[in-house]
UniProtKB/Swiss-Prot annotation:
UniProt protein name: Bifunctional enzyme IspD/IspF
Record-marked site positions (Transition state stabilizer): R19, K26, H267, T366
Pfam families xref list: IspD (PF01128), YgbB (PF02542)
Function comment: Bifunctional enzyme that catalyzes the formation of 4-diphosphocytidyl-2-C-methyl-D-erythritol from CTP and 2-C-methyl-D-erythritol 4-phosphate (MEP) (IspD), and catalyzes the conversion of 4-diphosphocytidyl-2-C-methyl-D-erythritol 2-phosphate (CDP-ME2P) to 2-C-methyl-D-erythritol 2,4-cyclodiphosphate (ME-CPP) with a corresponding release of cytidine 5-monophosphate (CMP) (IspF).
Region (2-C-methyl-D-erythritol 4-phosphate cytidylyltransferase): 1-234
Single Gene Ontology BP annotation: isopentenyl diphosphate biosynthetic process, methylerythritol 4-phosphate pathway
Domain of life: Bacteria
EC number assigned by the record: 2.7.7.60, 4.6.1.12
Binding site for a divalent metal cation: D241, H243, H275
GO MF annotations, alphabetized: 2-C-methyl-D-erythritol 2,4-cyclodiphosphate synthase activity; 2-C-methyl-D-erythritol 4-phosphate cytidylyltransferase activity; metal ion binding
Region of interest (2-C-methyl-D-erythritol 2,4-cyclodiphosphate synthase), residue spans: 235-398
Organism: Rhodopseudomonas palustris (strain BisB18)
PROSITE patterns in alphabetical order: ISPD (PS01295), ISPF (PS01350)
Catalyzed reaction equations: 2-C-methyl-D-erythritol 4-phosphate + CTP + H(+) = 4-CDP-2-C-methyl-D-erythritol + diphosphate; 4-CDP-2-C-methyl-D-erythritol 2-phosphate = 2-C-methyl-D-erythritol 2,4-cyclic diphosphate + CMP
Length: 398
């Protein structure tokens, strides 16, 4: 079912996560090298059917949040409330000025959500208006009294474990939250419960066993171990590119259009920084080089923007179930000066690759006036990429 309706997502990240132990709010803790909240937000930020991602955070965490999700595109964070329910309402109100048709509400403490689950949520909301992802209960459940004695054994065939993202028509869930606030009801533990209370029929759709919520220190230990074991094949690749100057008034460097008194002589846009990164990633995959995937003899790549090449290389990693641990590029030139451009370059590479800025390094050097770069005849770049792949992969995308 195609999505002709506008869909937004709310990421609830205002909690303190005290049960997860020391180390700050759990959504900002690192999990196998990436912040939990980055993992939770990225699938929504990159999903083709979602036009806006609205985080809800504690104002006290502003700097932590900014660093943790650098490179992702999202709405300005809404300040969280005293409860999860209050935080969700704040996110809904923040979206109301440009109201979507459908809204997905997801907990930042669930970092294993994927695009398939998000797509199922969107379709479920389109069909039913209110839906929650669930998984089957596999353990026997006991109901107890205040003394801890068993008083009942519910039929587990009729029980389900609820997850997020929960999906709703925006207008109905906003009104349900507003009504709950007016009536002083602040005791709901999820948004489906508010919808039920408001008289809505809440449907279920297929959740994902992997989409677990991180709650305790043991959860972090277990998932660190699992992710480390899954991605234990560590690869490193290097790349190099050079382009001569020609006529022009700008050059493309690391995804930025940089004013200059010369241009590049190149088949594509000549971005030596991104080209070197592409070669480094492909080299780590043992998957050829940029010229084998984008031949300079092919007219379709004439003047092409090099961010397409880098996105392609990143997709090759993803296709093997891997991820990029670190990218580094060194620009070698006399001019333009790279220092003032370093942080914008890191940000742009983060936007293209979906990596946290903390995993991207941009460096610069000169050749001390020696050679073609010293004579300002062109610019060179070297790069390295460190990848983590599942054991048993051959490094080649299918």
């Amino acid at each position: 079912m195609s999505n002709s309706k506008r869909t937004a997502a709310i990421i609830v990240a205002g909690g303190r996560g005290l049960r997860a132990g020391a180390g700050g709010p759990k959504q900002y803790r690192s999990l196998a090298g990436q912040p939990v909240i980055f993992r939770a937000m990225q699938p929504f930020c990159t999903h083709a059917e979602i036009f806006a991602v609205q985080p809800v955070t504690s104002p006290d965490d502003a700097e932590m949040f900014k660093l943790a999700v650098a490179g992702l595109n999202y709405q300005p964070p809404a300040p969280g409330g005293a409860t999860r329910q209050g935080s969700v309402r704040a996110g809904l109100e923040a979206l109301a000025a440009d109201a979507p048709d459908i809204v997905l509400i997801h907990d930042a403490a669930r970092p294993f959500v994927d695009a398939a689950l998000i797509s199922r949520a969107i379709v479920a909301a389109q069909i039913t208006g209110a839906a929650v992802p669930t998984i089957a209960v596999t353990d026997t459940i006991k109901q107890i009294n205040a003394q801890g004695d068993v008083v009942a054994t519910p039929d587990r065939a009729r029980l389900r474990i609820a997850q997020t993202p929960q999906a709703f028509r925006f207008d109905v869930i906003l009104e349900a939250h507003r009504r709950a606030a007016r009536e002083g009801r602040d005791d709901f533990t999820d948004d489906a419960a508010i919808a039920e209370w408001a008289g809505l029929t809440v449907a279920t759709f297929e959740g994902d066993v992997a989409n677990m919520k991180l709650t305790t220190p043991e959860d972090f230990v277990r998932e660190e171990s699992r992710l480390g074991a899954l991605l234990g094949d560590i690869r490193t690749g290097t790349g190099y590119d050079v382009h001569a100057f020609g006529d022009g008034d700008h050059v493309w460097l690391c995804g930025l259009k940089v004013p200059h008194n010369r241009g590049f002589l190149a088949h594509s846009d000549g971005d030596v920084g991104l080209h070197a990164l592409v070669d480094a990633i492909l080299g780590a995959l043992a998957d050829g080089d940029i010229g084998s995937h984008f031949p300079p003899t092919d007219p379709q790549w004439k003047g092409a923007a090099s961010d397409k090449f880098l996105k392609y290389a990143v997709d090759r990693v993803t296709a093997r179930g891997g991820r990029i641990a670190n990218l580094e590029v060194t620009m070698i030139c006399e001019r333009p000066k790279i220092g003032p451009l370093r942080e914008p370059m890191r940000q742009r590479i983060a936007e293209i690759t979906g990596l946290p800025v903390a995993r991207i390094a941009v460096k610069a050097t000169t050749s001390e006036r020696l050679g073609f770069t010293g004579r300002e005849e062109g610019i060179a770049a070297t790069a390295s990429a460190t990848l983590r792949l599942p054991w048993g992969t051959n490094g080649l995308a299918d």
